[in-house]
Design a protein with these regions (language model features):
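Bacterial N-terminal signal peptides that target proteins for export
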Residues: 1-7
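Compositionally biased regions
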Residues: 3, 16-23
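Phosphate-group recognition and catalysis centered on beta-loop-alpha active-site segments
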Residues: 21-249
Length: 249
């Protein structure tokens, strides 16, 4: 539970509200606190794998949080970025060497291999590796062991673990670079809602929160679903799809 405790404590410490120690002792927190496993229990294994989402659930997480990008054939998979050289062993695959390329994603030039250039079957031949070896070097012992999971597989895990544990395990997906993916004919909204509907997640009461740093995909989702939507914000800058706005606006 160590990493989940740290995440919960950090969330409280970084909140915009400040109370004194005496006030905290006099008035305990009210309401229901949920524990969200950001990218799974990523302090212990390479992030965004079924193994590490399962680990987080075993540690008591209420929600597992996948970042979602799309494949060439329109399947949602969990990766921190659509450029996957930092999170998989793709650079070691000679058969994919010619697909290394440079793209501009949300105004930033990136060189590597991108999920949208591969089918799901091709991505399933890859194995995950630690994204931040300088910070989580122990996780490197697990490099090469785990597949890239699909969103469907993550939802199936949450359903199975809910039944096994007697707890409701929710999902807290983030759409990554949605305006970019929409621009290349791979919008998130259709496959995202189709997968959630398959598992019965259609009402506001469902254990689902859909989050994004962008604006327009949340607006599109608002007209198509009753599920809860979360607008993510940075301390500075603008949404990638709304440069006319700053996050405080």
């Amino acid at each position: 539970m160590t990493h989940l405790h740290l995440l919960l404590i950090a969330t409280i410490l970084l909140s915009p509200f400040s109370i004194s120690e005496s006030q905290a002792m006099e008035k305990p927190l009210e309401g229901h606190v949920i524990v969200i496993a950001h990218r799974g229990a990523s302090g212990e294994r390479p992030e965004h794998t079924i193994a590490i989402y399962s680990r987080a659930i075993d540690q008591g997480a209420d929600y597992i949080e996948p970042d979602l990008v799309l494949t060439k054939d329109g399947i949602l998979v969990a990766r921190h970025e659509n450029e996957i050289s930092e999170t998989t062993d793709i650079a070691d695959k000679a058969e994919f060497a010619d697909r290394k390329t440079t793209k501009t994603i949300d105004g930033q030039k990136m060189t590597g291999w991108f999920t949208e250039d591969f089918t799901l079957a091709e991505l399933k031949t890859l194995r995950a590796k630690e994204r931040l070896p300088q910070l989580r070097s122990a996780n490197m012992a697990y490099d090469g062991q785990f597949e890239i999971p699909t969103f469907d597989e993550i939802l199936a895990l949450a359903k199975a673990q809910s039944a096994a544990t007697g707890r409701t395990i929710g999902v807290y997906p983030e759409t990554k670079h949605p305006s970019y993916f929409a621009s290349i004919g791979l919008p998130h909204e259709g496959p995202l809602l189709a997968a959630l509907t398959k598992y019965g997640h259609v009402e506001k009461s469902a254990p689902v929160f859909i989050q994004s740093f962008e604006v327009e995909n949340l607006k599109a989702l608002r007209s198509k679903t009753k599920l809860r939507l979360i607008q993510l914000m940075d301390e500075k800058g603008s949404p990638a799809d709304r440069k006319d706005l700053t996050y405080p606006q």
